[in-house]
Amino acid sequence: AIPCGESCVWIPCISAAIGCSCKNKVCYR
């Protein structure tokens, strides 16, 4: 998995728009 440089502790991954998803409080794709 590639980190998207975004955390998802309080809010969902905005980078989900480019295929990222939340894993262990960090957004990965």
Swiss-Prot record:
One Pfam family, short name: Cyclotide
Location in chain, cross-link Cyclopeptide (Ala-Arg): A1-R29
Any single biological process term in GO: regulation of defense response to virus
Keyword Disulfide bond part of the UniProt annotation: yes
PTM annotation, UniProt: This is a cyclic peptide.
Disulfide linkage: C4-C20, C8-C22, C13-C27
InterPro entries given in the database record: Cyclotide (IPR005535), Cyclotide_bracelet_CS (IPR012323), Cyclotide_sf (IPR036146)
Keywords annotated in UniProt: Antiviral protein, Disulfide bond, Knottin, Plant defense
Similarity comment text for this entry: Belongs to the cyclotide family. Bracelet subfamily.
Function: Probably participates in a plant defense mechanism. Inhibits the cytopathic effects of the human immunodeficiency virus.
Entry text on domains: The presence of a 'disulfide through disulfide knot' structurally defines this protein as a knottin.
Protein name according to UniProt: Circulin-F
Source organism per UniProt: Chassalia parviflora
Organism phylogeny: Eukaryota, Viridiplantae, Streptophyta, Embryophyta, Tracheophyta
